[in-house]
């Protein structure tokens, strides 16, 4: 399937892997794909930029810890102190949800009669996720409505073709 991805879409997936490594996560999930997509050119004009999303994901992490009575600052300090200096950890697997997003990106491209899967198709696939998904919650947290983002993405794709 990756042979159908544009250069920029492949870059977004590579950036998602990098985001998982940076965050110290053991698997690549939907929020990593969202961060990867937001790091590519062209989607910033739609309000999709990485720094606000990273801050929102950090807030979601902190809220989850606080919900079970853990002080997030103590966890952050412990993690920073114990994090190894080695950057690459080898293969990081994709979660089923992240794989489903990539499959949905293919379906989005087919539905729009596009020959290749671009960053926009991955972003469109992310807008189809459940409201409980961390990627959707991150979008909501920066006041980006997934349905409105979807309309803007489709409009941009139609304008480009």
Would you name each region that the model predicts?
Residues 1-161:
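Histone-fold recognition with a strong bias for associated Lys/Arg-rich disordered tails
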